[in-house]
Amino acid sequence: MIPLRSFGEDGNRAPEKTTRELLPEKATRDLSPDLLLLLQQKKMRKNSPIIIRIFKEEAELEVWKEDTSGRFQLLKTYPICRWSGDLGPKIYEGDRQTPEGFYTITPRLMNPNSNYYLAINMGFPNSFDKANDRDGSFLMIHGNCGSRGCYAMTDEQISEIYSLAREALLGRPSFQIQAYPFRMTPANLARHRTSPHAAFWKMLKIGNDHFEATHLESTVAVCGGRYVFDAWEPPNSSASLVFDPKGQCPAFVTNPKIAQLALQKQRADDLEYAQLIKNNVAVAPIYSGLDGGMNEVFRAKFPGVIVPLAMVLPPGSGLELPRMSPVPWTDDVSSLANRFFGALPGSNYALETHIARPAR
C-alpha cells in the first residue's frame, strides 16, 4: 500500500499514519457505486491514471482518466466553489493568487488530515516557478469553500476527487495537474490579449494543445525559464537531453506522435485568433479588481463572498502586481515553438514573449 502522508497547509506535519488501515475513514472511503458504474460505462479501470485539469475563469475542475484504449477521456467535471486572487499565475507568498501551470502530484502531497477536510497539495513552486523567482507554499485543492491561494471544492466533492487520486496513485509515482486561467480557446486568448500574462498563457496553450489533440499525457520539462512539452532527442544525437530550468534549452524535437496533431490544432486556432483580432473582438479588463471567483452553482448558497481584492490584500502587496516588469526572452531555433508552432503570416502569436517576475 502506498503511504499517504500528512502534508498540508494546516500543519506541514511529518506523517504519523502511513497505512490505509490507520488513515482517517474519509481518506480511505471507496468510490461510490454511481462513480464505479460511470467508470464501467466509460471503460476505465478503477486505478487507471488520471489528469486533473483546472479552468479558473470558468471555475471548473475536470478529472480525466485513462480508458482501455490507453488515452485519456473526461470522467467528470466538478464546479469550483472558490478560488482567490485574479487571473494570472502565483507570483509570491501572500498575493492570494492560485497557481497556473503544470504540476506533478506524488503520494506525499496527498493530505488526509487537512483542516479543510481533505487536500491535495499542488506542489507549488515547481521548477518553472522557481526558475522565475516565484514563491509561495501550501497551495491546495481542498474541501470547504474558502480560499487563500487554493482551489476550494467543498467537502463532498473533494472526497470524490481525493479518492480518485488515491486510486490512481496505487502502483504509480504521480499524476499531473494542468491549471489554466481559462479554457485555452482562441476567443479567450483574444479577449485577454492585453494582459501582462498573455505570453505566459500562450506558452501554457502549447501544453494544452498537445493534450487536447492527442488525449495523451504530455511530458513536461523546464529550461530557460519556460515550459517544454514532449521533447525528444534530435535524430542521430548521442547526448541525452538535460534540461536546466534556468539554463539554455538543449536542441530537441517534439515526439512525432504528438507534433503533427498538435500542429494542426495550433494552425486552426491561429487562423481563428487572427480573424478575431481583425474583427476587433472586445478586450476583457486586465484585472477584475475582485478576489477570485466561484462557479455559478454556488453563488446562491454563498452570497457576498466575492469581494474587492483591495479588501483582502495588505497595502503595498498584491496590488503592485499590475506594475511588475516583464522579463523578455526569445525562443531559440531548436525550441518547440519555432520548430512546430511558428506563427502564420500576419498572426498575432508572437515568438518573443515575456514572463512576469516579482520585483526584489
Question: Where in the sequence are the language-model features?
Answer:
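Extracellular/luminal recognition modules and glycoprotein regions
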Residues: 7-46
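Short Gly/aromatic-enriched secondary-structure transition segments
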Residues: 67-83
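A short alpha-helix/helix-coil micro-patch that ends at or immediately precedes a cysteine
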Residues: 61-66, 154
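Exported/periplasmic cell-wall-interacting domains
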Residues: 94-252, 256-257
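Low-complexity, Gly/Ser/Thr/Pro-rich intrinsically disordered linker/tail segments
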Residues: 31, 185-360
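N-terminal post-signal-peptidase region of extra-cytosolic proteins
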Residues: 33-51, 63-65, 82-93, 100-106, ...
